[in-house]
Amino acid sequence: MNSTSAEEIIISPLKEELIEDIHKTNDSFKVFGKVVPSFQSGKWSFEEILFDEAKDVRFPDDQLDWIEYIDSEDKALFLAYKNNDCIGQIRIVQDWNRFCYIENIATKEDFRGQGIGSLLLTKAEDWAKERNLLGISLEAQDDNLGACRFYVKQGFVLGGVDTLKQSYNPQIDATLYWYKLFK
């Protein structure tokens, strides 16, 4: 694992010449447990269950019209670079509910745990505050415990659960909705 300081990282908005870098951050990640949500007295809480064996999962590369994320008022994609290598990204949109919705956040495997995700979230938060949005939201599958732990560490709270959205996937029991409200 490399060591990275914030001074070494450049966060760049998407430009046409950077489109080829978008999928470079889509590495596999470990699925080692799941979040089990509970709703009581109007509040969400959760427990963690660890799996006996971890497995590697990789999402397919998104096939989008990336030009739409360049110089747009209501969506953006930011790429994180170290020594001209793309090591992370965050893709965001202004949602109907006045939240900045994170469509995707990813850090290359070798750079996880070094603050890249935090830097990208800070960039998204700045973008959202410039637009006077209420906060940031995202969704994660219940079996992506590593990501859910990261979101909690970054100040997100569980705001909802959908048990039908991923019905086609027998591995996923629930989609979890996470929120970070601005004060």
Model-derived segments and spans:
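C-terminal "cap" of GNAT-fold acetyltransferases
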Residues: 3, 134, 141-148, 154-157, ...
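Extreme N-terminal starter segment of soluble prokaryotic enzymes
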Residues: 7-10
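Acetyl-CoA-dependent GNAT
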Residues: 16-17, 24-99, 103, 108-109, ...
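Residue-level signal for alpha-helix termini/capping positions
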Residues: 71, 129-130
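Residues within well-ordered beta-strands of beta-sheet-rich folds
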Residues: 81, 137-139
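Conserved acetyl-CoA-binding loop-helix of GNAT-fold acetyltransferases
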Residues: 107, 113-126, 149-153
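Short coil/turn segments at alpha/beta junctions that flank glycine-rich nucleotide-binding fingerprints
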Residues: 114, 130-134
